Amino acid sequence: MSLIAIERVLCGWPKICRKLIVTSRSLTSGLRRALVKQPRKGGDVGKPGMELGRCSCFGLRVNLSNASVVYVGHRRYSTYEKTSTQILTKLFPQTSEESNDEESRERRKLEEEEEQKELERAFRRMKLGFGLFGIGSMLFSFWAIYFYGRPSLDEHGNEVIDEFSCLPQMQQLMWRTWKSVNRFQRFFKEPSRKKLLPDPLQPPYVQPPYTLVLEIKDVLVHPDWTYETGWRFKKRPGVDVFLKECAKYFEIVVYTAEQGVTVFPLVDALDPNGCIMYRLVRDSTHFDGGHHVKNLDNLNRDLKRVVVVDWDRNSTKFHPSNSFSIPRWSGNDNDTTLFELTSFLSVLGTSEIDDVREVLQYYNQFSDSLSQFRENQRKLGELMHAEEVEKTSKSRPVVKNWTRGFINH
């Protein structure tokens, strides 16, 4: 118990003692009156001629009959439960077992009425809110139709004639508004500009022969979150070697659906040597079917020499023949995908292929493109070794071969 609770108990103890004394006096006086002034009820309480007995209670000596003692005891014990309940009620009001049904019903009735009134007030507020919202929406619609449906003005303030000028006034407003809505829709769905990359470098500058478009999330890095550090980005094993080797043959471009506020500082930390030449973020994508798609038509590069590396085929669904899919990285340290991808792209860059889409289409028909590339490399190595052995055997001197045959015979 706290000090405040102990103090309250000590302060209230005299009051409780006074209540106990008053209650005991009341019980004593009531019992005394019952013993001294006993009621008589004909033949119900006793028989005539019975001897009187003597009883002592709290210093009082009175004469009682046996029947009177039984009667008094009956009264005493029949009212014991009621008297004890009254004592507890006086001392501890919360332990009273008697409930006023009428007050309870009245209280429940008041609560129900108050709840009903609150529901009515809430319904009125809701109707008022819907009404204000409807009026506001109507006024805004009228303003939008007038603002976006009016004809354009030239620099001299004259109306510009368009394809809707021959229609009635109301139809002009509606069709121009609809055209403006479609323009806004294209603004949010299509890339922010027609040319995402500048024109290729001209001599004396060196323009790489191929363009490599990379997704950064789960291809080069993987976001990781912990209670101790929060969000961090983990580098994929081999990413430094991958960027360094690919920069020899490719113009490297990071093209992602992430926000620029995340991508730009991440690329600065990932590529301190500047192997990545350009960075394209979400505003450069085309939103279609719930996906941010990399639209290579706006890349300003020859698509015959563009390779897109990504794990999500929906991101390159406009140009599947230019995509090369690799497994998505989940942060494991024993991943070797970038090392294998470096070998593939190095072979592709040194082969001087005019149209890379033919090679990419061939490997896209396999579920694991890099495994198929390794198998093809193994077969090519065996074939080259066999050709080398055959060439070596054919290049032996004729005299040496004739001498060996002569000795054998």
Curated annotation (Swiss-Prot):
Principal subcellular localisation of the protein: mitochondrion
Q: Compositional bias of type Basic and acidic residues: which residue ranges?
A: 102-111
Q: Tell me if Protein transport is a UniProt keyword of this record.
A: yes
Task: Give the species.
Answer: Drosophila melanogaster (Fruit fly)
Q: Which UniProt keywords apply?
A: Membrane, Mitochondrion, Mitochondrion inner membrane, Protein transport, Transit peptide, Translocation, Transmembrane, Transmembrane helix, Transport
Assigned GO CC terms = mitochondrial inner membrane; mitochondrion; nuclear speck; TIM23 mitochondrial import inner membrane translocase complex
Q: What is this protein called?
A: Mitochondrial import inner membrane translocase subunit TIM50-B
As for family, the record states: Belongs to the TIM50 family.
